[in-house]
């Protein structure tokens, strides 16, 4: 966690590229980001990966709510298939928290793992109809994720 009281709380928002329920994502972000602001008494700064789906909704959210944000795009030309995990690692390094909308995709799983490797707490929100859309859990270590991911 950043110690400077003037610095914002950096929150990565990530999830599937094909998930487009704007209203659901916005409602979750309103609640979780409000809790983070209240807990730390600091503004938030959103980090998103520049992809379609949840990333695009997070960017739209930041613009509509006048929240500062950073877009960290994957360099697919330079890094090929490793570009996504590299980008996720970079976003995790920048973050105090991650909010990941999850339905079992590799990219979202990579974001969760990269954040947990760097000791960044992750809110995982199910967007899987199999598990139940909207179920939330906070994870703070890889061991818990290894167990919990089987439930998703």
Residue ranges, per PLM feature:
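Acidic/glycine-enriched connector segments
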Residues: 2-11, 18-145
